[in-house]
Amino acid sequence: MENFRLKVFRVVAEQLNFRKASELLYLSQPAVSQNVHMLEEELGLRLFDRTGNHVVLTQAGSTLLVYARQAARTMEQAMQALAALKGEVSGDLKLAASTTVAQYLLPRVLGTFLKQHPLVNISAISGNTEHVVDALIEGRVSLGLIEGPALRRDVKTERLLQDRMVLIAAADHPWASAGTIGLDALQQMPLLMREPGSGSRRVVEVALKRSGTRTGTLRIAMQLDSTEAIVSGVEAGLGVGFVSQWAIGKEVRLGTVVPIRVKGLDIVRDFSLIRPTGPEPDGTAGAFRRFALAFTFATDMHTDNNGTPQENTTHRKPQTLAATQKSQRRSR
């Protein structure tokens, strides 16, 4: 029920690309251009400056985008409120998740959530923690899932699940048979790290600093944009790297990588749900938030002696939100 021309403008403004916008809107590119032109005529203001293949928002366009996003959110909230009167959870839900969460946690949460609420349409984007926080603040998503806290006053962080970062080496690496190394040895070996802005990198740097090791003293051989890339690099013998315990279950079982304990270094963090500071969200976003907090309680993990995550067998069957909340109350 969102005003159609305003929706076309909003999608173009967010993509800054008419071709991408046309694909998202399932319209031809000329139809997108025509709708934008008609809106500009109606308002008497130019909304975009077009220079060759580049599109930028004018001051009027930037101003309108703020209100277009607000209008879209308000209309979606209205539809969700009406659905709630019928006892349904329905509507669109836009999420952003950091890469580790998107790969290893979000799929299991979404799979169960959609079984219970099949009328919800979910769209999700992924990036590093910094990008997820930006998407939330800019209003492009309703909720975010990240590694660690957001560290912003305008963002509320809620813990979902504990994670541990472990150092891994290839099975034929000299450290594989030792199993344990000292911090001084870590400084001598090529290290594969996530890119700046990543929650994984930040938590590793903070832990190393607390242990008296500065990042500048390490031999950072490569900076990579995903956990999978680090695992693959380690398997190929390019160095060692810190990754989430969730990322290496298969590789440890296959024997391609080995977790290495570092004396005096224990890197623990939280996977967290983030939302704008203020009242708890309602509608579809509120339903997902409550479900996610309850779901991760019901499927919490423990680790074996290798630091590999193992699911608690007492919670293999997914619980409904009401059942999980009842269980939480009993355990208090």
Task: Give the label of every model feature segment.
Residues 175, 191-212, 281-283, 298-305, ...:
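Secondary-structure junction motif
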Residues 128-133, 137-141, 146-147, 205-258, ...:
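Hydrophobic hinge/microswitch elements
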Residues 40-57, 62:
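A short LG(V/I)-centered, amphipathic sequence patch enriched
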Residues 90-153, 224:
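Central regulatory/effector-binding core of bacterial HTH transcription factors
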Residues 154-192, 196:
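Flexible hinge/capping segments at coil-to-helix
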Residues 11-28:
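Short helix-boundary/capping micro-motifs
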Residues 153-159, 163, 185, 228-277:
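Beta-alpha-beta core module
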Residues 105, 258-302:
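A late-sequence structural motif
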